[in-house]
Every structure is written in structure tokens, then in C-alpha cells.
Amino acid sequence: MEICRGLRSHLITLLLFLFHSETICRPSGRKSSKMQAFRIWDVNQKTFYLRNNQLVAGYLQGPNVNLEEKIDVVPIEPHALFLGIHGGKMCLSCVKSGDETRLQLEAVNITDLSENRKQDKRFAFIRSDSGPTTSFESAACPGWFLCTAMEADQPVSLTNMPDEGVMVTKFYFQEDE
């Protein structure tokens, strides 16, 4: 009888420890607005860089590899995020003007954006992973995807024809170390 009571006591202690640890280790459900830097390059190996204040995709070699722009990311939902460059001081946005939809860089601090403000929706992108690649759809302009041209040194833009093969909409997206 004494052995059973001792085992039961140890078992209860073990269970309390396990459940207590699980509660402490589990995320609280609050989203993190912490900015993280990522490397991005398209499936044709073109990386992003800035040329005349415009985001461009091309093949950087030699000393030019230092021109590569890291993408600053602030997650806002499980698959939605804000994208920026230059330490989050310039943000990518989807702007619709008449029939034209275009990608532009805006001088906005990425950490000042909020998923709850309607005017900030133009900065939000939906991330979709497919195997090793990722695509980014505009939250403000559904059906419009971040893309690069087939040719090098062309502006990063948006397309509403992701499967036509004219523009590249699949990217490798890796947290920068």
C-alpha cells in the first residue's frame, strides 16, 4: 500500500510538471509584431536590389552581391504579412488607380502598420507556400501577385496572371541569419 501511495505521488508530481511546462511553452495566441529579415530570390535565381529608388530583380555577382535587399517582414496573421526594405523604413504596397494596379515602395515604418487600419491593407500580402517556393498575393488587390520579369534587371511588380508564364511569381524565401 505504501509503494502505491509513493508511486501515485510521483505520478501526480510528474503530470503536474508536464502540464505546467506545456502551458508555459505554448504560444499565448498573441501575434508577434517583431520584424524579421528574409532573403528572397525568384525561381530563376534573381535577387532583389534597389536601383534609382525602385526595387529590381537581377543577377548580382562579385562585389555587387552586397546590393541585395533583404526583405523585412512583420507577420500579422498566420499567412499574412507586411513587407519592407531598408530596416522596415520602406514598405511594399499595392496601389490601384483606375484600371492600373501597381507595386510601389512607400516611406512608411513597417512597425507602425496595423492590420486593423483599412488604409494599411495596401501593405499586406498573403503568403502561400508550395513545396520550397512561396508566392505573395496582395491583400488589398486579390488576384494580384508579387512578380519579377523573365529578363534580369527589371522592376519587381504585380501580375494578375500568375500561371501564364510571362512573369515569375514563385520565390525562395529564407530567414536571414
Curated annotation (Swiss-Prot):
Keywords in alphabetical order: Cytoplasm, Disulfide bond, Glycoprotein, Pharmaceutical, Secreted, Signal
Disulfide bond residue pairs: C91-C141
Pfam families in alphabetical order: IL1
Keyword Glycoprotein attached: yes
Signal peptide (residue range): 1-25
Alphabetical list of SMART domains matching this protein: IL1
Glycosylation site list: N109
GO cellular component: centrosome; cytosol; extracellular exosome; extracellular space; nucleoplasm; plasma membrane
Gene Ontology MF: a single term: cytokine activity
GO terms classed as biological process: acute-phase response; immune response; inflammatory response; insulin secretion; lipid metabolic process; negative regulation of heterotypic cell-cell adhesion; negative regulation of interleukin-1-mediated signaling pathway; response to glucocorticoid
Tissue specificity note: The intracellular form of IL1RN is predominantly expressed in epithelial cells.
Function: Anti-inflammatory antagonist of interleukin-1 family of proinflammatory cytokines such as interleukin-1beta/IL1B and interleukin-1alpha/IL1A. Protects from immune dysregulation and uncontrolled systemic inflammation triggered by IL1 for a range of innate stimulatory agents such as pathogens.
Disease: Microvascular complications of diabetes 4: Pathological conditions that develop in numerous tissues and organs as a consequence of diabetes mellitus. They include diabetic retinopathy, diabetic nephropathy leading to end-stage renal disease, and diabetic neuropathy. Diabetic retinopathy remains the major cause of new-onset blindness among diabetic adults. It is characterized by vascular permeability and increased tissue ischemia and angiogenesis.
Family to which this protein belongs: Belongs to the IL-1 family.
Protein name: Interleukin-1 receptor antagonist protein
Organism (species): Homo sapiens
